[in-house]
Amino acid sequence: GTRYNDMGFRVGFQFTGEHSVDLNASVQLDMLWVEPGTFTMGSPTTEADRQADREDEHNVTLTKGFYLGKYEVTQAQYEAVMTGNTDSLSATPSEWPNNPNRPVEKVSWVDAQIFLTRLNAQQSANIPAGWAYVLPTESQWEYACRAGTTTMYSWGNDINATRANYNVSGLSQTRDVGYYAANPLGFFDMHGNV
């Protein structure tokens, strides 16, 4: 398949309770619990700048809660898990390297799956049998991103450089995770960065 090396990602975890992972002596992965619930997924056909291929609004019920990374996976987290991998993948693939608190980017979906396989192996003694670190489903991600709101963004219907790092904010590169305010559920950078 085609490799797209320009994505970032978050880690999900199928388990209840508080969860924080020590990846090494100085790197931690913080995750927040999201309660199950029902929300409206998709966007209204009247939404400004809506892409034609976007899903129309429809109700989705998540019957199980889940964990999601409080931040995008950082360069330091990615390096802590991927150092020594045997898949010929760089442990430091970033366009803007040596920024440990910026999100990792220039990774493909396959790279993210290898990261998760390695994370699960490294943390196998610390997680219950049958549970695993995974990429969130589209429904889980949108539910956490919307955070109970019905607007285009979790803070309203407008976006600007004080709220998110995005293609016209003028920065032309990533920022440290958590630079902008969190959404109502406590997740950072759900709109923008990578």
Question: Each PLM stretch: what is its role?
Answer:
Residues 91-94:
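Surface-exposed intrinsically disordered loops and tails
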Residues 12, 70, 75-82, 113-120, ...:
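Non-transmembrane alpha-helical segments in soluble domains
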Residues 8, 23-88, 107-110, 191-192:
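A short glycine-rich, aromatic-capped structural motif
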